[in-house]
Design a protein with these regions (language model features):
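Arg/Lys-rich, low-complexity, intrinsically disordered basic segments
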Residues: 1-97
């Protein structure tokens, strides 16, 4: 499956992910437009708090790369400090191109 990340066309969201698998196309918008994430502030304590807060309800979905919560968790709040590396890491984690 191929993944393309770009700026969101949704006024309230930060990024858009388009998953292409043959003729099937899935579009997901994710990340709050005005929000600050680990990619922005690089604050490990805030990242830890975000993960703890969201994993209680979202962890069961983290195996589905097309879910907005998974995209946010591993791209905006992952281990990388810049967007390009975060996307590359995400693609590797979920075997996407």
């Amino acid at each position: 499956m191929k993944l393309i990340i770009s700026n969101s066309t949704n006024k309230n969201k930060r990024l858009k992910a388009v998953f292409i698998d043959g003729n099937k196309k899935i579009t997901r918008h994710f990340g709050f437009k005005g929000g600050s994430t680990y990619i922005d502030h690089k604050d490990k304590e805030k990242r830890k708090n975000y993960r703890k807060r969201h994993e209680a309800t979202e962890k069961k979905f983290y195996t589905d790369p097309t879910r907005p919560s998974t995209l946010s968790r591993f791209i905006l709040w992952g281990n990388e400090t810049n967007l390009r590396d975060a996307i590359k890491s995400y693609k590797n984690k979920f075997n996407l191109s």
